[in-house]
Curated annotation (Swiss-Prot):
It comes from Rhodopseudomonas palustris (strain ATCC BAA-98 / CGA009). It is found in: Cell inner membrane. This is Glucans biosynthesis glucosyltransferase H. GO terms for cellular component: plasma membrane. The chain crosses the membrane at residues 53-75, 85-107, 404-426, 456-478, 490-512, 567-589. The lineage of its organism: Bacteria, Pseudomonadati, Pseudomonadota, Alphaproteobacteria, Hyphomicrobiales.
Length: 721
């Protein structure tokens, strides 16, 4: 069993007794699901069938028109091998753009008509009553503990203000491997648990299956006591209003297994993060409304800020281990898509609620941090290729897998398309053409394209990319209240222009990063599990130059290649080349943090900040003492209550199995036995030995009882004794 801590209403000093009354064990079986056999499930009638026909027909017609025009561009004089490659790549990329455009157009239309969702969630009016038991689950991995707990506590206070707080229990499920983070989490927990009940903290000594395993462990141990669970990320904040409304919707719709809210990016401090924040705020609702409208009861799950029916999840979403070696085999990384697909396969409806406000998240502060997270997502999404043939999946669930895979494969396809285009031009410029083939022909073969039609194809493609932005802008401008929340019409229009320009500069760089990620995965390189970097995004100049050297070199090569052919080709490729050549200065500019109020790209949450976000800052400051020690051993040695809390939690660890030796713990025991003082022993222990000691009650007590100078006391601590 893992270390689990739970508060009682007694005095917070009674740590040993307080740790005993855990939430009553309510085991809930979560069997691993088979991908080879389809379970018997009740039929789900979706009103979205005709909507999907409309979307697919419109996408097919638009794609056919674009592909036909591109064929007409290339077929002048016959299609060569390189031109055939360009046509195939264009067909795939244009169909991708067409589907995105049609879906966004659907979102624009339904929002103009007042559509909200298919589960009847009211976004205003009085709050409904809730009678179900709801668990708020916050999985965390080596995050900034005071900020993580502050976000959770702000969410809790918002729920309590609705008068429905008694229905909610709160769990922090830690997979942290950093000893300092582990002890800091316990310190923050103790601070909040002293005055708040129904708050629980559990640390897993082994983070098996990462986040999905963390959630599954909770379901199997405590899930039977709860009707619903809300999954949060370490950067999630949700208002009580949105939580009560989605919980009531789950009660009303007994066949709904999951409702995904639309998280809005907040707290952006760098220019890069502000671009993502503004884009998500202004374009996100329209795009989400479009996908929710035609996905219907086969919508997707994004892994956080969603409410899930616990019994449905336990009975249908147990993840199998994929056959083969990493990166394609092993544990399923992008588990959210798969869990939603398995729940839908079992007959549960999956919905997206795109119009609910009050669901928030944060964004990586720089493109490098975004790309690091994207690398893990890329591997997880490509892994879904093994799941496309799973038995019994709904075709829309398979489409989710395909679009997730396509989100990353389109990057190397775009790069290949650009390179093939340059090669065609170089071939026409420098390679002597074979005007007369070896076989008999009355007419020569002229290598040529139609430049006028090519310009129209380019303009049409750009139109499909830009028009959704203009439609979203139109939705803001036509509503006076929405327009004011974005700072006015002129500032909103200027924000769209600035966002479009910066996105155009960073898109080619992201293309290179994603292409590199795909190649690495195909070569068998695993992404691992890195800590998500949050904060101000500051990156040393040397690191920026090193990481952006490849995009810059590629841009230089493309520019030289285009210049060797002709100035028109160079001008044609300017949007891509400029972004690559300016990769380093743009990176330095967009990672610079600013506390000042921006003139453009303002969002409603910046102009009129929700109270819950201000509470996060205040709570984080309260939970982070100025002279707090970062040494976990010193923290335990200098604070009796924290030490007793930690030791009480370790009482729930399973006993060591005979014959199984932890080499780091064994090394630590030898070093501790050989040391003449606490300071000497602590100085000899490395990070892995410290973590092993923190997880073993007997060894930790032996270390802390050694004589030696005490660690500096933390604020509010008591002398050891």
């Amino acid at each position: 069993m893992d270390a689990v801590i739970a508060p009682r209403h007694e005095d917070c000093r009674d740590v040993e007794r307080r740790a005993e009354p855990l939430p009553a064990n309510a085991p809930l079986p979560m069997p691993v699901q088979s991908l080879l056999q389809s379970p018997r499930a009740a039929a789900v009638r979706s009103p979205a069938a005709w909507r999907r026909v409309l979307i697919m027909v419109a996408t097919a017609v638009l794609s056919a028109a674009g592909i036909y025009e591109m064929y007409q561009v290339l077929q002048v004089g016959g299609i060569t091998v390189l031109e055939g490659v360009v046509l195939v790549l264009f067909a795939a990329l244009f169909a991708w753009v067409a589907l995105s455009f049609v879906s966004a157009l659907a979102g624009f239309t339904v929002l103009c008509c007042g559509w909200r969702d298919d589960v009847g969630i009211s976004t205003d009016g009085s709050l409904p009553s809730v009678s179900s038991r709801i668990a708020m689950l916050l999985p965390t991995y080596n995050e900034d503990a005071p900020v993580v707990f502050a976000r959770l506590q702000a969410t809790r206070q918002s729920v309590d203000e609705t008068g429905r707080g008694a229905q909610f229990d709160w769990f922090v499920l830690s997979d942290s491997t950093d000893p300092s983070v582990w002890i800091d989490e316990e310190r923050c927990y103790a601070e909040l648990a002293a005055t708040h009940d129904r708050l629980y903290y559990r640390h897993r000594p082994h983070n098996t299956a990462r986040k999905s395993g963390n959630i599954a462990d909770w379901v199997e141990r405590f899930g039977g006591a709860y009707d619903f669970m809300v999954i949060l990320d370490a950067d999630s904040v949700m208002t009580g209003d949105v939580l009560v409304r989605v919980a009531a919707a789950m009660e009303t719709n007994s066949d709904v297994g999951l409702i995904q809210t639309l998280p809005v990016v907040v707290q952006a401090r760098t220019l890069f993060a502000r671009v993502q924040q503004f884009a998500g705020s202004i374009y996100g609702p329209m795009i989400a409304a479009g996908t929710a409208w035609w996905h219907g009861s086969e919508s997707n799950y994004w892994g956080h800020n969603a409410i899930i029916r616990v019994s449905a999840f336990a009975g249908s979403a147990g993840l199998p281990t994929l056959a083969g070696r990493k990166p394609f085999g092993g544990e399923i990384l992008s588990h959210d898509f798969v869990e939603a697909a398995l729940m839908r396969r079992a007959g549960w409806r999956i919905h997206l609620a795109p119009t609910l406000r009050g669901s928030y998240e944060e964004c990586p502060p720089s493109l490098l941090d975004f790309a690091a997270r994207d690398r893990r997502w890329c591997q997880g999404n490509l892994q879904h290729g093994k799941l496309l043939t799973a038995r019994g999946l709904h075709w829309v669930s398979r489409l989710h897998f395909l679009t997730g895979i396509g989100a990353y494969l389109t990057a190397p396809m775009w790069l290949a398309f650009l390179i093939a285009g340059i090669l065609i031009s170089l071939q026409a410029q420098f390679v002597r053409p074979e005007y007369f083939p070896k076989d008999f022909s009355l007419f020569p073969i002229w290598p040529a394209q139609d430049p006028v039609r090519a310009a129209w194809v380019f303009a049409g493609t750009m139109g499909l990319l830009i028009l959704p932005k203009l439609l979203a802008l139109f939705l803001v401008l036509i509503r006076s209240d929405t327009r004011r929340r974005f700072g006015g019409g002129l500032r909103t229009f200027g924000g769209v222009l600035l966002e479009t320009m910066i996105s155009a500069l960073t898109a080619p760089v992201m293309m290179v990063f994603q292409s590199t990620a795909v190649i690495e995965i195909l070569l068998g390189r695993d992404a691992g599990w890195q800590v998500q970097h949050r904060g101000d995004g500051a990156i040393p100049l040397r690191e920026v130059v090193r990481r952006y050297a490849l995009p810059t070199a590629l841009g230089t090569t493309m520019a030289i290649g285009a210049w060797l052919v002709s100035w028109p080709l160079l001008l044609w490729m300017t949007p891509v080349i400029v972004g690559l050549l300016l990769a380093i200065p743009v990176a330095l500019l967009t990672t610079r943090a600013s506390r000042s109020r921006p003139l453009l790209m303002m969002t409603p949450e910046q102009i009129d900040p929700p109270a819950i976000l201000a509470q996060v800052h205040a709570l984080a400051d309260r939970l982070c003492p100025a002279n707090q020690t970062t040494d976990p051993l010193s923290a335990l040695r200098g604070d009796r209550r924290l030490r007793e809390l930690h030791l009480a939690a370790l009482a729930f660890h399973p006993p060591r199995r005979r014959g199984r030796i932890d080499p780091h713990l064994a090394t630590a025991r030898v070093l501790i036995d050989d040391a003449e003082s606490y300071s000497e022993a602590a100085g000899w222990l490395g990070p892995r030995e410290i973590r092993a000691v923190l997880g073993d009650r007997e060894t930790l007590q032996r270390l802390l009882q050694l004589s030696g100078e005490h660690a500096q006391l933390a604020v509010g601590s008591e002398p050891s004794g």
